[in-house]
Structures are given as C-alpha cells and as structure tokens.
A protein has these predicted regions:
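Loop/turn elements at helix/coil->beta-strand transitions in domains of secreted/extracellular proteins
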Residues: 107-110, 165-172, 195-199, 227-232, ...
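Second-shell loop/turn segments in exported
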Residues: 78-85, 143-150, 172-177, 209-210
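Active-site neighborhood of HAD-like aspartate-dependent phosphohydrolases
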Residues: 85, 105-111, 120-152, 166
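Active-site-proximal beta-strand/loop segments in catalytic clefts of secreted hydrolases
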Residues: 115-117, 124, 174-177, 202-205, ...
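Substrate-recognition "cap/lid" segment bordering the active-site pocket of phosphatases
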Residues: 179-232
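Non-catalytic pre-domain segments flanking phosphatase-related domains
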Residues: 2-114
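Acidic, Mg2+-coordinating phosphoryl-transfer loop and its flanking beta/alpha structural elements
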Residues: 217-262
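Substrate-recognition element of Asp-dependent hydrolases with the DxDx(T/V) motif
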Residues: 118-119, 148, 157-190, 199-204
Length: 262
C-alpha cells in the first residue's frame, strides 16, 4: 500500500510544477484505495485512528515511538489526501492574519521562526516508503534521504514564507538537523523556493543529548536577548518546536502524525 501511495505522490508532485499543487489532484485516487480505515477515521480493531491523531496533534498523546500498525493506511490517506493540505492551509492563513494585525517595527528586527522538516520541507517521499511512521525511526536511512536534498516544499508554508517577506519580516529557520547537514539543507531550501533568510540555525555538538525543547529554547533566547530580534511568530510540526522559553508572540502547530520529537 505504501508503494502505491508513493507512486501517486511522486506523479502528482511532478504535475504540481505545472498546475500549482499536488494534493487536490490525488483525492479521488486516494479514496479509491481506501482500506479498512478511511480518512474519516473509522474504528480498526478497537482503535479510532482519527481519535489517535487528534490526541497527537493536541499533545495529549506523547512519548510515542511509532504510529500504530493498524493506522498505517489511515495516516497514509491523510498525509497524501486533500485533508492534510486543507489543515495546513488554515494554519498558514491564521499565521498571516496574526502578522497583519501587528504593528511591525521598522528596525529590521521582527523575525518569524520556521522549523524545517515537515514545516518548510516535506519528507513524505521517505515516509511513504517506511510505513508513514509505523516503522521505527532509522537515523542512518533518514539521514541518507536528507543528503539527497530532494525534499519538496510544503506548499502552504512556502506561501506563508513569501507573504512574510513581502511584509518586511525576516525569516529564521531553526531546525534539529545537525551542522554537517548545513550545505544540503541550504541547497534544498533554495531549490524549492526558499531563496533567502536571516539565519539558518542547525544543531551543534554542544546540544548533543539535549532535548529539542531545550535546544530550541536556547536558540530563541539568543535571538531575542543577545541578537535583539523580536520573534513575532513561530511555526512547527512538533510541540517541541513551540514549547519552552522565548516562543514568540504566537505559535502555530502544523499537523504531523508520522513521528514524535519530545
């Protein structure tokens, strides 16, 4: 099932370059493949996958290592179907409305913090080949995928990025990727439309063994208290992108039911 979904994903991703977006194009195809758990989250062996995903997105289901096996097809349908794109669109729009409501400074110190993986860049081609999060995380295989530099942009995040730049807001990318992945990350971001940024912050060795919350809090604190920036917004797919200190005026959580980072 994962390979079939990946074929649809890659084929429609190519079409997106000419037609604008890939998600709406595959909606009917995905629903033709609907297995025992459809995108409405019907019960599977006593488990509602829709309810499980809701618990994940609200940070009530925490500390999990893998997606429940019985939810693989449901998560695949969600991620490659139209609902994921619709959910992301609502969040990106609210983020833009938030910025429009602010009195932006003229000193060039207003910044917006973006996470990278599953926020600006999508690793769906990788996860479609690995059970949409059902398989345990394999750092060797995932890092090999990252080094290809082939991650596509998340369309709604790219739109938000461009709108923020048009308003004079500077962008900072704050990612859990490590410093040795800087070059490929820069190249990948630029190749899909993220052409400029104020800073790209990657995880240095001094944060080895630290939680994502501790690492990102420290970096945001430095941005505000040492560099003099004002974080007007912060968007990510993990709650660990948004919790801790110096989180910004508002935070925005994008959907991601494929993996958990605490």
């Amino acid at each position: 099932m994962s390979k079939m979904l990946l074929i649809f994903f890659l084929a429609t991703l190519v079409a997106a370059n000419a037609h604008g977006s890939y998600f709406p194009l595959i909606t009917n195809q995905i629903h033709l493949l609907r297995p025992q758990s459809g995108s409405g989250g019907s019960y599977v062996e006593g488990l509602s996958c829709l309810s499980w995903r809701f618990g994940v997105e609200t940070n009530n289901v925490i500390g999990w290592k893998t997606v429940p096996v019985t939810c693989e097809d449901y998560i695949g349908h969600y991620m490659l179907g139209s609902q994921y794109r619709k959910d992301s669109k609502v969040i990106a729009k609210e983020a833009f409305f938030h910025v429009k409501s602010l009195n932006l400074s003229k000193n060039g110190k207003d910044i917006w913090v973006f996470d990278v993986d599953e926020t600006t860049l999508s690793n769906l081609p990788y996860y479609a080949e690995h059970g949409f999060g059902v398989e345990p995380y394999n750092s060797t295989e995932f890092n090999a995928w990252v080094l290809t530099g082939n991650a596509p942009a998340l369309p709604e995040s790219l739109k938000l990025y461009k709108k923020l730049l048009s308003l004079g807001v500077k962008v900072v990318f704050l990612t859990g990727r490590t410093e040795d992945q800087r070059t490929v990350t820069e190249t990948n971001l630029k190749s899909v439309g993220y052409h400029t940024w104020e800073k790209l912050i990657l995880k240095g060795k001094e944060f080895s063994g630290k939680t994502a919350v501790a690492y990102k809090s420290a970096q945001r604190k430095k941005l505000e208290e040492e560099d003099g920036y004002r974080i007007i917004g912060n968007i990510g797919d993990q709650w660990s992108d948004l919790l801790g200190t110096n989180t910004g005026l508002r935070t925005f959580k994008l959907p991601d039911p494929m993996y958990y980072i605490g």
